[in-house]
Amino acid sequence: MFFKPDFRPRCAKWLIATGLFLMLGACVEKPTTLERVKEDGVLRVITRNSPATYFQDRNGETGFEYELVKRFADDLGVELKIETADNLDDLFDQMNKPGGPVLGAAGLIETPLRKQQARFSHSYLEVTPQVVYRNGQSRPTDPGDLVGKRIVVLKGSAHAEQLAALKAQNPGIQYEESDAVEVVDLLRMVDEGQIDLTLVDSNELAMNQVYFPNVRVAFDLGEARAQRWAVAPGEDNSLLNEINAYLDKVEKNGTLQRLKDRYYGHVDVLGYVGAYTFAQHLQERLPKYEKHFQTSAKKEQVDWRLLAAIGYQESMWQPTVTSKTGVRGLMMLTQNTAQAMGVSNRLDARQSIQGGAKYFAYIKDQLDDSIKEPDRTWLALASYNIGSGHLEDARKLAQNEGLNPDKWLDVKKMLPRLAQKKWYSKTRYGYARGGEPVHFVANIRRYYDILTWVTQPQLEGSQVADGNLHVPGVDKTQPPVPPASPVPSSSSTDESPL
């Protein structure tokens, strides 16, 4: 007879231990979304590829949404990983996939349909939906005028929801949704007459209007609406709460306003005539001087497109011009400045550009070390226009008002005061036409934006120099009256000391 050991007590103990282990495991809390982001060291964000959200230029990633979310990632101490959606429907689909992006940052509007797809943050920007049409066509004035028009909008957009609601009230309104285009494409289609109308947000129209000067606003379709970030509906509140705290913080400390100023504070300085004229001159005048701008800019370590923008603001790229105050040439140098920069003939385009580049680099180098980019560039431009003494007066006024003298957004508020006795009587250098540098900088920033856009990597090469660069919106059959420009000089030398 064999001995049969009894394993039941051991088995019971093993089962009890296993059960306790499983119970304890069940009691361990699952990490929150925010904790997972910090543990992984990566914030995955999905956005759209467009000028108002995110794109890449020769300096890398940029865009309003990108900069705002990059600062958020920096606050969290994690790396930012950007993913781009094929369209808006794809954006929400990707966010709702297991392991997908945890944040959508793409100028999103909270709508009834989207509330089922995501949860939304506090607002950071207000925009107005606008119906746009082509100049020369019949202008719609209300939703009833949309009947019988070919309308195309972005697929899955808040604009598509607006039109669906209008169509429910008026079945005669017909529209198409496209997932093969972006806002820039829609504006081009209107500009070229491929479609009658589209619907875009005011901020995106403002950023792109200059490229399509035939595009006009027909009417606003409803009130201003808030743009927000989105998180997936199935996630906990940890990340959303952190986002809201961050957006509140950048609103209070001025960071958000500075970003708005950087991307939107100068976009409306060109009207139809200005945009039309600049587009023409890009093809007709810039190619003659582009190499000079590039050579001088490289020598002085300045972006050639910024230098070209200064030249356009000063003379509209005309080398033999003279103002009533005696400044001359393509970069409109004074006699004293020209001599200091080694320019013997201000009416020689190459010399003028060299002198202007050298002078701008000198001014920029003289600014306080505490001034960082991009404010350093904007303040240097103001100094280029009004003089370093008056700029310092404006900076001191800003400091006295509790503002930041190193920030262009604050200093530009003070510059117009230099024309008011109440204020200039307290300054070292006295009266100045302080409003001029504000407009000067705004114009140059806009020209620079356009030059940056049309010389992106895919447009590089000889397209500008060869005159083959397509600038949308230029219809030379009926040009508008151009704005006033400096009076061309009849002399090709610089013999008269003005």
Curated annotation (Swiss-Prot):
Class in the EC hierarchy, top level: lyase
Catalytic activity: Exolytic cleavage of the (1->4)-beta-glycosidic linkage between N-acetylmuramic acid (MurNAc) and N-acetylglucosamine (GlcNAc) residues in peptidoglycan, from either the reducing or the non-reducing ends of the peptidoglycan chains, with concomitant formation of a 1,6-anhydrobond in the MurNAc residue
PROSITE patterns for this protein: PROKAR_LIPOPROTEIN, TRANSGLYCOSYLASE
Family: In the N-terminal section; belongs to the bacterial solute-binding protein 3 family. In the C-terminal section; belongs to the transglycosylase Slt family.
The gene coding this protein: mltF
Protein name: Membrane-bound lytic murein transglycosylase F
GO terms under biological process: cell wall macromolecule catabolic process; cell wall organization; peptidoglycan catabolic process
Stretches the record annotates as Disordered: 464-498
Domain remark text: The N-terminal domain does not have lytic activity and probably modulates enzymatic activity. The C-terminal domain is the catalytic active domain.
Coiled coil spans: none
Species of provenance: Pseudomonas syringae pv. syringae (strain B728a)
Gene Ontology cellular-component annotations: cell outer membrane
Span list, region LT domain: 268-498
Primary localization class, coarse: membrane
Location of this chain's protein in the cell: Cell outer membrane
